[in-house]
Amino acid sequence: MNLHEYQAKQLFARYGLPAPVGYACTTPREAEEAASKIGAGPWVVKCQVHAGGRGKAGGVKVVKSKEEIRAFAENWLGKRLVTYQTDANGQPVNQILVEAATDIGKELYLGAVVDRSSRRVVFMASTEGGVEIEKVAEETPHLIHKVALDPLTGPMPYQGRELAFKLGLEGKLVQQFTKIFMGLATIFLERDLALIEINPLVITKQGDLICLDGKLGADGNALFRQPDLREMRDQSQEDPREAQAAQWELNYVALDGNIGCMVNGAGLAMGTMDIVKLHGGEPANFLDVGGGATKERVTEAFKIILSDDNVKAVLVNIFGGIVRCDLIADGIIGAVEEVGVNVPVVVRLEGNNAELGAKKLADSGLNIIAAKSLTDAAQQVVAAVEGK
């Protein structure tokens, strides 16, 4: 679950991290009043969406008058911002962040993720602030410096100083950087985060560090013990199909293709998407119905998949280990009858009672194509989309 920039900075403030004075506003009038609270300009106005690339898309602007603030708010509030990280529809702009402008001397990067290879929380710092860290990692990986947190000791001040020295910081900036490092690490661990970024972390012309931007991603599996983060959730920024799937404990991610995929198991789902691509198809989604694929969940999965108007065919790929394939077949038949599926449905069953399940599908009299293998399933669903 992602947070908005203004929400990230609210958390920064609670943990004593320096950030520009700012207010999230939902109307042009509130935006003007926020500027008055902040004081003399210039100010920075920022569209609040769960996506990067806002500046290049016109969603961030330095303004020198309240008239400009009102014009920016009137232009963006209630609209959708399209960036390179969104789809063609963009994300809705429901808040504008109004902040005091900062005199930027130099831009740095500081962030942390859970590194699966080392099984540690790893902090990354770079002198290449203001640039996507993925781009830095690809083009100039030697400019990224890392430290891993020991789960027994947690973050240590010497690690912050180590990163500061590698960034070429001196004097009071080393102390300020270490404080920010310790604060970010504390937020990451106490709030069960999966990602935290300050990009850019700015050295002002006055010689101080300030968190100019903030990006936080919470671990969805830990939200049950983070009630204040749950309250910050903005479902308007999420795909409604993904929200509906979460209510049924279905793992769904919307994509841009036209072949709906329903699979039990995340690994099998990724493999299914790969083989669909291999045979020239484009998956419309990732959908893992999990081990408890009941008729009700299969029905709901069909509803979610078919709510995407781009879907021209559905591929169901089930491996019967925990669940029996004949019960899955009953669920598929019931779901197709209830939902009224009007696109071709290709089903591949393998494992426990697979033959009985295939027989039930064949005897159902419905427009369900039984595949003999995963390759056969991919070929048939691609052919169905192409009208062959």
Curated annotation (Swiss-Prot):
It holds the Pfam family ATP-grasp_2. Gene3D superfamilies: ATP-grasp fold, A domain (3.30.1490.20), ATP-grasp fold, B domain (3.30.470.20), Succinyl-CoA synthetase domains (3.40.50.261). The keyword Ion transport does not apply. It catalyses: succinate + ATP + CoA = succinyl-CoA + ADP + phosphate; GTP + succinate + CoA = succinyl-CoA + GDP + phosphate. Keywords: ATP-binding, Ligase, Magnesium, Metal-binding, Nucleotide-binding, Tricarboxylic acid cycle. One of its GO terms (biological process) is tricarboxylic acid cycle. One of its GO terms (molecular function) is succinate-CoA ligase (ADP-forming) activity. The keyword Phosphoprotein does not apply. Mg(2+) binds at N199, D213. Pathway: Carbohydrate metabolism; tricarboxylic acid cycle; succinate from succinyl-CoA (ligase route): step 1/1. Its cofactor is Mg(2+). Substrate binds at N264, G321, I322, V323. Residues 9-244 form the ATP-grasp domain. One of its GO terms (cellular component) is succinate-CoA ligase complex. ATP binds at K46, G53, R54, G55, E99, T102, E107. Binds 1 Mg(2+) ion per subunit. InterPro entries: ATP-grasp (IPR011761), ATP-grasp_succ-CoA_synth-type (IPR013650), ATP_grasp_subdomain_1 (IPR013815), Succ-CoA_synthase_bsu_CS (IPR017866), SUCC_ACL_C (IPR005811), Succ_CoA_ligase-like_bsu (IPR005809), Succinyl-CoA_synth-like (IPR016102). Its EC number is 6.2.1.5. Heterotetramer of two alpha and two beta subunits. Succinyl-CoA synthetase functions in the citric acid cycle (TCA), coupling the hydrolysis of succinyl-CoA to the synthesis of either ATP or GTP and thus represents the only step of substrate-level phosphorylation in the TCA. The beta subunit provides nucleotide specificity of the enzyme and binds the substrate succinate, while the binding sites for coenzyme A and phosphate are found in the alpha subunit. Belongs to the succinate/malate CoA ligase beta subunit family. NCBIfam families: PRK00696.1 (NF001913), sucCoAbeta (TIGR01016). This is Succinate--CoA ligase [ADP-forming] subunit beta. The gene is sucC.
